[in-house]
Design a protein with these regions (language model features):
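Short, polar/flexible loop-turn hinges at active-site or ligand-entry regions and domain interfaces
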Residues: 90-98, 115-120, 219-220, 289-291
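A non-catalytic, helix-rich entry segment at domain boundaries
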Residues: 108-180, 185
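Mg2+/Mn2+-dependent nuclease catalytic core
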Residues: 182-273
Length: 313
């Protein structure tokens, strides 16, 4: 690479032709490369893209430092090919209903702490649902078509909120930070960041990092993999503030369980080494244009299965 601090990503290389076809089919070409691109009709896609590629795609260049987050590391670990589609090619995906329900519940739990402590009841949380759902619909109108039974949708979100109140009593503490963005250049060319659902600082200075999950807790033996996300957040907070968080807490609203961990400096130093290793592997994948697919049961939930080389020999 000409500049070690930046990575040039060949977005429209020969290896990406199937991805380009996919993007064109769903009408995203103008959004990707700008207004100078002529409208491309559905059908005979490859012929039209070949005619336009010299004048259009030669103008596209992407140079940026590598952005890492816990979710990006997880995507690359699970399937480098999926990571490429999402993080390198930035192919669009339709919203996930499970993820959107999670967003709604997260929003309510964030806004709950705007209410004075005595008023943070399950009833007040559920009362927030309709207005927050309306705001979510305004931001993403496609959800109107996806959610066919709005009452059932809101009832399921309310059930998750009710579970939260069996696990914590929000009237007994103040959330110091909500949706807190942590970031750090932990290497000259690697930008590490993440969003913490809630970070509590006790009057005595101890720090608790909390993440809400609307799914179910991991099976016994899989807790460490789930805690990786919070250890990255703890590492960032430690590097930025010089304070080692006292407690990491995953709150699973799907089955009413909590996974806790008291991080140590050794664990966070090990987490940092893991991040360096993944960053190195991703740089190699970018340089060599090598993104192996990892077929697994997760493929059935992957939106890109129809264009994935592992399923289209």
């Amino acid at each position: 690479m000409s500049n070690p601090a930046f990575v040039g990503v060949p977005l429209f290389s020969r290896r990406n032709r199937e991805a380009i076809k996919f993007a064109l089919r769903i009408g995203q070409l103008n959004a990707i490369a700008g207004s100078e691109i002529p409208k491309i009709r559905h059908g005979s896609i490859l012929g039209e893209i070949n005619a336009a590629s010299t004048s259009i795609f030669s103008q596209v260049s992407i140079e940026q430092s590598l952005r890492l987050s816990p979710s990006a590391v997880s995507e690359y670990e699970n399937c480098p090919q999926q990571y490429k589609y999402r993080k390198i090619d930035k192919l669009p995906e339709p919203p996930s209903l499970d993820a959107e329900r999670g967003t709604l519940v997260h929003t309510v739990l964030q806004d709950l702490f705007e209410i004075p402590a005595a008023g943070r009841t399950v009833e007040s949380a559920i009362e927030l649902l309709p207005s927050r759902w309306s705001a979510q619909l305004a931001d993403k109108p496609v959800l109107l078509e996806m959610v066919t039974n709005e009452k059932e949708w809101l009832d399921r979100a309310a059930a998750l909120l009710k579970t939260y109140f069996t696990l914590e009593n929000p009237t007994t503490f103040e959330a110091t930070h909500r949706e807190m963005h942590l970031e750090n250049y932990f290497d000259t060319n690697v930008y590490l960041h993440g969003y913490v659902d809630r970070l509590d600082v006790a009057p005595t200075g101890e720090v608790r990092i909390v993440d809400y999950k609307t799914g179910k807790a991991p099976r016994p033996g899989w807790e460490e993999k789930a805690l990786f996300q919070l250890r990255v957040y703890a590492l960032l907070y430690w590097k930025n503030n010089g304070v080692l968080p006292r407690l990491l807490q995953l709150i699973y609203l799907g089955d009413g369980k909590i996974v806790k961990s008291n991080p140590t400096t050794a664990q966070l130093e090990s987490t940092e080494k893991v991040l360096h290793r993944f960053a190195k592997d991703i740089f190699i994948s970018i340089e060599k244009e090598y993104w192996p697919a990892k077929p697994s049961r997760l493929c059935d939930w992957c939106y890109f299965k129809s264009i994935c080389p592992a399923h289209n020999d």
